[in-house]
Design a protein with these regions (language model features):
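Functional-site microenvironments in short loops/helix caps that host divalent-cation chemistry
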Residues: 27-179, 183, 188
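A short glycine-rich, aromatic-capped structural motif
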Residues: 1-14, 18-38, 87, 144, ...
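Intrinsically disordered, low-complexity segments enriched in polar/charged small residues
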Residues: 9, 164-167, 198
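Short, structured beta-strand segments at or near domain termini in extracellular proteins/domains
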Residues: 188-198
């Protein structure tokens, strides 16, 4: 949340905390953030996305926009689904070493339905990032905590997300599990991770 707040000046989360993952963002909010982060760190000329015809809800969340990706740009962007899976596997192409990102034991690497409760009387909530073991590439929370939007479309209106969330069953936190929803949807268990082409 800390970086999201610094770049956009807003925080879409209900439960606030600098080290919590940003969530409750639409796919459109995520690509917009990527451009804003690029402008701040690299300049507008390196923005990967052209975003036009933006529509927002009463809270300022983007609910629709026309988005195209210039793959020659080096700015921040959402990973493709293939890039996301390679990162979740620790950067090992074709490596099927672990069921989850960094381990076969989900409790070592992920916050999910089975361990995210503070106690059985409270509801699940996202946890601070980096509290579980990293994978081989040094990446945290690629299984569990919050799902992550990817660039890829499932159909005209829907986008893929990966990784599982704190409210997910263990089967949804594997490196191969994939889901999708309308790009305008936002949930407590859905966030994103940025990447760059080098």
């Amino acid at each position: 949340q800390e970086l999201y707040m610094a770049v956009t000046g807003t925080n879409p989360r209900i439960d606030k905390g600098e080290k919590l993952p940003v969530n409750r963002v639409t796919w459109y909010d995520a690509v917009y953030f990527c451009n804003e982060l690029t402008k701040v760190t690299m300049g507008e000329d390196e923005c990967c996305y052209s975003i036009s015809y933006i529509e927002k809800d009463e809270d300022g969340n983007i609910t629709w926009a026309k988005v195209s990706w210039d793959q020659n740009k080096k700015g921040y962007r959402l990973p493709t689904e293939a890039e996301w899976e390679m990162a979740a596997r620790g950067g090992v192409q074709g490596g099927w070493d672990y069921k989850y990102s960094g381990s076969d034991d989900i409790n070592v690497v992920a916050w999910y339905d089975g361990n995210a409760y503070e106690n059985k009387c409270e509801s699940n909530v996202a946890k601070n990032v980096g509290l579980k073991k990293a994978n081989k590439a040094g990446l945290y929370d690629m299984s569990g905590n919050v799902y992550e939007w990817c660039w890829d479309a499932m159909n005209e209106w829907s986008r893929i997300y990966r990784g599982g969330g704190y409210y997910s069953y263990s089967s949804e936190c594997t490196v191969i599990y994939r889901a999708y929803d309308d790009a305008y949807e936002r949930y407590n268990t859905l966030g994103f991770r940025v990447c760059r082409s080098l």
